[in-house]
Amino acid sequence: MSTGLTPPPQPIKRPPKAVTWIFAIIALIILIAPMSVGFYTDWLWFGEVDFRGVFSKVIVTRIVLFVIFALIAGFVTWLAGYFVTKLRPDEMSAFDTQSPVYQYRQMIENSLRRVMVLIPIFVALLAGLIGQRSWRTVQMWMNGQSFGVSDQQFGHDYGFYAFDLPMLRLVTDSLSMMLIVAFLIALVGHYLMGGIRAGNQMTGQKSFVSRGARTQLAVTAGLWMLVKVAGYWLDRYDLLTKENSTFTGASYTDINAQLPAKIILLVIALFVAIAFFSAIFLKDLRIPGLAVVLMLLSSVIIGAAWPLMLERFSVQPNRAEKEAEYISRNIESTRYAYGITDEDVTYEENWGAGETTNEEVAADSATISNIRLLDPQILSPTFTQQQQLRNFYGFPDQLAMDRFEVDGELRDFVVAARELDPNALQQNQQDWINRHTVYTHGNGFIAAQANQVDEVARDVGSTRGGYPVYTVSDLQSNARAAESEDAEQLGIKVDEPRVYYGPLIASATDGADYAIVGDTGDGPVEYDTDTSSYTYEGAGGVDIGNMVNRAMFALRYQEMNMLLSDRVGSESKILFERDPRSRVEKVAPWLTTDSKTYPTVIDGRIKWIVDGYTTLDSLPYSTRTSLTEATQDAVMPDGTPQPLITDKVGYIRNSVKAVVDAYDGTVELYEFDTEDPVLKAWRGVFPDTVKDESEISDELRAHLRYPEDLFKVQRDMLSKYHVDDSGTFFTNDAFWSVPGDPTAAEGRQELKQPPYYVVAADPETGESSFQLITPFRGLQREYLSAHMSASSDPNTYGEITVRVLPTDSVTQGPKQAQDAMMSSDQVAQDQTLWRGSNDLHNGNLLTLPVGGGEILYVEPIYSQRKDQASAFPKLLRVLVFYKGQVGYAPTIAEALSQVGIDPKAAQDIEEVDGTTTTPSTDETDTDTDQPATETPTAPVSEAEGIAAINDALSNLEAARDGSFEEYGRALDALDRAVDSYQSAQ
């Protein structure tokens, strides 16, 4: 029988605690799983490269710091909350019960235990996560070294600023932040718990601070002021790294106003701390209040107004004299910090002031015979088309430079490893099995002598000539006696030409650069050559033969095929982290690596050489620089692409040379600066990870280069810090600048010209030397002011020479030389004619000191057909600029002769018919605007012409299935046959 009454709603049942715990555990696993997978696979990887000690030291240090910061921050937070609850009023007034915060007090008291746990845990976790990031600072402090150099103001060794001061700052900043959090908890907590009450005139409520609240807030504030006292003491040292408008370091105002102000404020802060502590015993808060007002007024008057007045009325009218001492300090410290002291740099003042004859220039065979014609920034497509072999091989966009001996003479070479390019795989090659188990490695080492090409290319339309002369060591050439002998004579014969590690291999756009290798029981499956397959036999790689490891990597790369594919067996390994630079950065997380890595051949194996830098954020009076900005140029408009420990540095050394084996990925770190205290500190942190400098083999040392990024940083510094006199430095009159690159693409010509590796005469001995060079122009002027070179030769490595040109005469700079060359009548005429069907590329504009006193500019011109998808750049012409004259010809010898330099030392280049061209100044017109003319084709009969055309067409058809080079030669033969036939009509 219905009563007409609605039954009461059923209460919502809470899920059982077990279900709640299950969901919580699942959520925790989801959060922790990715981190655990990364941790485990990295642990395996570090074991594979034999650097697990680095991994363990970093992890343990970070965990310890996490625990220390978490415990201290959690305890301070808990203690603040504990005193809030302990010191809260026992009774509430009528005003308190009517307060809107009363309900919050009730909520807090009802869940007091939970609040007292959750808030400290949250703060502890946050502090731990922040604190563990400072592992480098802590380890550097624990292993600090002496520099043997002291600052000019306080007399402390630089080691104090490099290792101790950052640690002291970490401690004071951390304590300061923790005390601020504790103060806020006390303030808010006492307000909610009734210990602090704001007054209200409308209700007649008076403000109120309980004794407990006053005591807790006063003690916390007093402790914070004591930390501030320590902060003021450390602030004195920070003045030495302060950046001013003219220089870095403490200025006259800083030393005579800011420094005394810090001491005075320190004393006042100490009195303020005492005033806060007095509030424990005094009910009157006016004493701490007055102390705070005194502190604020002192900060404004003593800390700001006094230095400002001294700056305005004493320093500004006499800045050059007042700042002279401090500018001198800045010059001295900056030179030391960047390795450009007088011990590191040799200045040749008034270089070229005397008369240098053309005969002396021609006799400079070390430079003239090594003039570089191949531009590694342009020729990557040429290498790719002529040496690619298969579509899945490739070369980096920017090739590298190295040097080798040819017939006892040092020559520079464009070098590259033929790597696997994962982004070039065709659609049918991109399934998981092909990509990760078949196409796993590259093949071979390629070198092309930089001062010669195969043949002279006189005709822009010809497909012959103007291409590099390659020496190759790969699987195919090793099987051919003649090519193998050529490689062996050059010193690049590779016993193991397979390339499993390299920057191009690691450039997969999806980040999956791994390869699965090893014996699967079904025989070799990796592509090796068209007629053979291969099974990886190297020591590199992480074992994934067991299901645990396999599952972990399947999770890391989110790839089920690792678990399901038959290509993964009990003997399988996974190769990953295949970029040489990333491998070095991972095993040496304290290094900043150079943006360029390059391959070479050491002991019959392809090795990648990576330059490593030790850096510091700052040193006293040392000018800081941005590594990103300093490395920007026309080739790298965005600066170094490498991850940086810190972008702005005040100290840098190329302390480590790293070598990565291209076959098994082995990483070797070698000490290279035996005097660097920062490296010594890191070797203390990670013992037995860096080999002694004495262990560098002679073969490896012969291929070490002066690193580009360091050179760029040093040239930026030398543009200012070559100046000795503080007065001259202050006026900027003698500053230099790096010229823009006039050969760069439109929009980049104002960017700095990159430095170039060349083989040229050693500044002291005149012998052939492998150098990194760059010109300087005057500040806001285009005329050449100086020329800088750094030696890479084993006996003189790192010696920097700066040739300073006379100031009473002018020498055209790179832009002026480029303008003169490109405005030459014949050059302009040819460019206009050729651009219709060709893309013309201006190669590197080399600024070469020659003959002991003259400057020679050399620039190769490359052409590339527009109407051919497979076209690639070739050397077409060579431009030279010398003493206001322009040389323009298909060969460097002809171009030199046009400007009056006997080219007897220049490299001979074969003509198409097999002859060589080496004109002398007696045989060649030196008129700079006269183009070279082609040898006329001998006339033939009509029947012979038709027969020759038919033969050429047959050869062209037969060459369609051959290489691009064979097809190009067939096209060229057809062109010659047509020309011969037309000349007979």
UniProtKB/Swiss-Prot annotation:
User: What keywords tag this UniProt record?
Assistant: Cell membrane, Membrane, Transmembrane, Transmembrane helix
Protein localization: Cell membrane
Q: List membrane-spanning regions.
A: 19-39, 63-83, 115-135, 176-196, 215-235, 262-282, 290-310
Its cellular-component GO annotations read: extracellular region; plasma membrane
Give the matching InterPro entries: UPF0182 (IPR005372)
Matching entries from Pfam families are given as: UPF0182
The principal localisation class reads membrane
Task: Provide the membrane topology annotation.
Answer: Multi-pass membrane protein
Amino acid composition bias (Low complexity), ranges on this chain: 929-939
Chain residue ranges for the region called Disordered = 906-944
What PANTHER family does the record point to?
A: UPF0182 PROTEIN SLL1060
The family assignment reads: Belongs to the UPF0182 family.
Q: What is this protein called?
A: UPF0182 protein cgR_0895
